[in-house]
From Swiss-Prot:
Keywords: Chaperone, Cytoplasm, Ribosome biogenesis, rRNA processing
Compartments where located: Cytoplasm
Role of this protein: An accessory protein needed during the final step in the assembly of 30S ribosomal subunit, possibly for assembly of the head region. Essential for efficient processing of 16S rRNA. May be needed both before and after RbfA during the maturation of 16S rRNA. It has affinity for free ribosomal 30S subunits but not for 70S ribosomes.
Gene behind the chain: rimM
Protein name, entry field: Ribosome maturation factor RimM
Organism: Streptomyces lividans
InterPro entries: PRC_barrel-like_sf, PRC_RimM, RimM, RimM_N, RimM_N_sf, Transl_B-barrel_sf
Main location: cytoplasm
Amino acid sequence: MQLVVARIGRAHGIKGEVTVEVRTDEPELRLGPGAVLATDPASTGPLTIESGRVHSGRLLLRFAGVHDRTGAEALRNTLLIADVDPDERPEDEDEYYDHQLIDLDVVTEDGTEVGRITEISHLPTQDLFVVERPDGSEVYVPFVSEIVTGIDLDAQRAVIDPPPGLIDDRAEIASARDAGAEDAGDEA
């Protein structure tokens, strides 16, 4: 099975290093020197990691055969993909690989069907489930414990407790100040 472990960002310097957006909790295992990674698009790989270092809180990698800024820039936005055992699980029981979550049914705590997870969107602040609703529309569900209250891989479902307005049109006013501002606007 293949697992996306990183996305290549901008070139760093003139000697072929690139910044990397890490998408694995085990970068030392998956992104170490000598690791051979498949790529998406496939035409840019496979890539062999020659060296890696952390600079200003960012992981920088250099790949075999890429020795200048031009070569590094050509790799920008390439996904790095590692082969993993399909039965491998993350060490933390509350962590999941994307492939484990794709195609899970999403229901609310009261059992109401929301849809099916079609994609995991990895953003800088949090991950999002992209959920396809029965009518074909999409809803984005933040993958945070306050909203995603349970994942049952055996039952193939994710249980959510969405705040009003996340999956419907029943948004509530966030604060009393906002409520006061709306009331004042009604008087004008």
